[in-house]
Amino acid sequence: MLYYAAPMEGFTDRVWRQTHQKWFGAQGAADRYYAPFISPPENRVLIKKKMAELAPAANPGAPVIPQLLAKDGELAAWMIEQLRALGYTEVNLNLGCPAGTVTAKGKGSGMLRDLAKVDAFLDGVFSRAEGPVSVKTRLAKMIMLSLCAFIWKRRILLIIWKRHAKRMIFTANRR
């Protein structure tokens, strides 16, 4: 069985990843550590402090997967290029964050309200970005088939976090 460490903003940073590897060693360390999300800057100027979190030197030996939170496919593709330049082979797109501050901006699970926008976003990413890109999401019954069609069309590795699925179905039906 593979062990993936889920991202939790403000908790699973590089210090946590290093400590986890140190104390649990090769036998107990995660097979992958998903980094807390970063949003690509609209002005396309990287923020040094945020990029320091993902610097390979700050994550020695840790198989880290950067996670992007975006709603513009072209901008996300640009950010993926920047992460590839740092040596990352896989990048994860976050379509699952249920936080109100995120969904209000049409990002994370807020993007799932408009499947045409999801399709356009994924087209923007996959028409420009190269290499493996996975998608983290939460699935509500009403969108599962459509979203799976988008995923299948692009041969995306899909990661589903089940924990809040019931809450998401409830809140999605209220809107």
Which residues fall in each region the model found?
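Intrinsically disordered, low-complexity segments enriched in small/polar residues
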Residues: 1-2, 31-32, 86
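N-terminal small/glycine-rich loop or linker at the start of catalytic domains
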Residues: 1-2, 41-63, 97, 104-105, ...
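Hydrophobic faces of well-ordered beta-strands that scaffold small-molecule active sites
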Residues: 3-6, 33-35, 64-68, 91-93, ...
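Glycine-rich, positively charged N-terminal anion/phosphate-binding segment
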Residues: 8-82
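Short, electropositive, low-hydrophobicity segments enriched in small/polar residues
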Residues: 14, 100, 112
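Alpha/beta enzyme core
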Residues: 22-28, 77-91, 95-105, 116-175
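Conserved phosphate-coordination/catalytic loops
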Residues: 70, 112, 116
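Short glycine-enriched, charge-decorated loop/helix-capping segments at active-site entrances
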Residues: 106-112
